[in-house]
């Protein structure tokens, strides 16, 4: 959120570009959060996923635009639904506010469309240091062209949003917003109650301690709590989950929705009434549902449905669909049922959608002709990934 100009504290302004044109700390910190999220995205793109393609950098501009516009549109939507319309102009970002839920929603939709269309139009160069065995033994770095699943892109992008949210929440502090109810002690004393629970802020973060005394009462610093837990979840999802054995593509991305949904659902219910929106509470619950369903799907069903063309899957007939699902949970799946054969025959390799292939870059690459980065065409009988020298 972002309060109106008149309700901001005097220390919310960083500097002035001219008479009547203040630059707020809120905007600066949100920009820093976006920049840091982009940095984490680029670092993982280059050093972990080893992608060499400018098309992925183009999406950064799309993501920033959709994040801001989606957050702004969602703010206007929840204000209208909850009957609190401020009447401010949509493009006057210094008045009114932003709601991150809308930014996440619109950017996710933009990513699905962009990467799904992009991945079906072309293959992408990925860097592989490999042992090339075609009557020779040698180690060489090659750039292999292959299709990349949009679920892998979700794993790459979603965790970076968390650290952006964690940093951006400090902008809410400078705007004196995203706080909880007033703390009141047994003797109607807010100071004693604040010292009991949040006294450590007086030493560690004195500015935060002073800033949480709003309208004569100490308020729970929800922005600080959300920033802390977003950082913890970011570290786990971004740095740890990629190295957990058995984690399938898509699970990391949906873990973001689960994590941010849990944090926001708990904190949204604790907000001060002036900043509490029922729409945000419902949306946070939906994020949790999306995260749980997505993780279950990626860890269980997705691997069994890999390589099937879903258009034929849904249109082939309800009885064939039922027959197909019965085979998914049979212990012996060495022989597919007739409906499964039918789906495979309809799914010509050139028509299979990368969206549902769910492949990581460390998958075993099948024997085929690989187009190298220097446009040299070679046939490899076997391509085995080995650690880089």
UniProtKB/Swiss-Prot annotation:
InterPro entries: Lgt (IPR001640). It is found in: Cell membrane. It is a multi-pass membrane protein. Its EC number is 2.5.1.145. GO terms for cellular component: plasma membrane. Pfam families: LGT. GO terms for biological process: lipoprotein biosynthetic process. Catalyzes the transfer of the diacylglyceryl group from phosphatidylglycerol to the sulfhydryl group of the N-terminal cysteine of a prolipoprotein, the first step in the formation of mature lipoproteins. Pathway: Protein modification; lipoprotein biosynthesis (diacylglyceryl transfer). This is Phosphatidylglycerol--prolipoprotein diacylglyceryl transferase. The chain crosses the membrane at residues 28-48, 58-78, 98-118, 148-168, 220-240, 281-301, 309-329. Keywords: Cell membrane, Membrane, Transferase, Transmembrane, Transmembrane helix. Its main location: membrane. The keyword Transmembrane applies. One of its GO terms (molecular function) is phosphatidylglycerol-prolipoprotein diacylglyceryl transferase activity. A 1,2-diacyl-sn-glycero-3-phospho-(1'-sn-glycerol) binds at residue 169. Belongs to the Lgt family.
